């Protein structure tokens, strides 16, 4: 029995190591040549496995890109974003969420450019992975807009729908990269700029604190 469990553990470790090599190969390939199409044969060769192994591990080309995008976002700081969303104050949720999103994009900038660029050329695999990430992001924007409204933070002339649209634009990779790459701002400066834009556009003025 002990021998069987040991063999099962070795097989599991071997499977995880294979999965890791394939994901690492894809990430490295995207960083090296972000504008060139990705071939499964090339990824298999880089990972030192057969092409069929890639499909056995991930099910499909789309499954491979889904797994990579999920891992990249997790590794880059998704936990910080989750923490921001859980903050009881909607305004702090807004600030922390934008800050965490910017840090994720900054950490992933090279690969993110490749993924977003390739999504239009490869809509079924790369595009599908990005679409699913963006759908989750949109859900987050709607949730934040509702929270701001429920806590009386939205300006009277801004609807929940309008707030969600504005947040969607400001929290996008395109907005981040326009400031980070286009203007040469640091990640902290980008986060501060986007947060200021969001609060000035959407939120009521905060009453200054007064001494009791």
Label for each model-derived stretch:
Residues 1-48, 56-57, 62-63:
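Basic, helix-initiating cap at the start of DNA-binding domains
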Residues 149-197, 205-212:
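Hydrophobic/aromatic-rich alpha-helical bundle segments in the mid-to-C-terminal region
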Residues 103-114, 125-151, 161-165, 192, ...:
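Amphipathic alpha-helical packing segments from all-alpha helical-bundle domains
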Residues 40, 69-77:
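Short, basic, alpha-helical segments at the C-terminal edge of helix-turn-helix-like DNA-binding modules
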Residues 58, 117-122:
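Short helix-capping/turn signature of helix-turn-helix
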Residues 52:
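Key DNA-contact positions within bacterial/archaeal DNA-binding proteins
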Residues 67, 80-107, 164:
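Hydrophobic alpha-helical connector segments
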Residues 58, 68-69:
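DNA major-groove recognition helix of helix-turn-helix
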């Amino acid at each position: 029995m002990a021998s069987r469990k040991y063999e099962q553990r070795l097989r599991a470790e071997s499977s995880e190591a294979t999965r890791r090599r394939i994901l690492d190969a894809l990430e490295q390939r995207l960083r090296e040549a972000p504008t060139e199409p990705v071939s499964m044969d090339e990824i298999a060769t880089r990972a030192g496995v057969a092409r069929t192994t890639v499909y056995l591990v991930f099910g499909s080309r789309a499954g491979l890109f889904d797994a990579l995008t999920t891992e990249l976002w997790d590794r880059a700081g998704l936990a910080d974003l989750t923490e921001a969303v859980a903050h009881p104050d909607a305004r702090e949720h807004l600030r922390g969420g934008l800050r965490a999103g910017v840090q994720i994009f900054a950490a992933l900038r090279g690969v993110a450019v490749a993924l977003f660029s390739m999504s239009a050329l490869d809509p079924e695999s790369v595009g599908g992975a990005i679409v699913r990430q963006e759908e989750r992001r949109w859900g987050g924007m709607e949730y934040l807009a509702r929270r701001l409204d429920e806590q009386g933070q939205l300006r009277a002339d801004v609807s929940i729908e309008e707030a969600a649209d504005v947040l969607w634009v400001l929290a996008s990779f395109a907005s981040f990269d326009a400031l980070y790459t286009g203007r040469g701002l640091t990640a902290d400066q980008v986060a501060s700029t986007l947060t200021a834009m969001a609060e000035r556009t959407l939120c009521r003025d905060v009453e200054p604190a007064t001494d009791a």
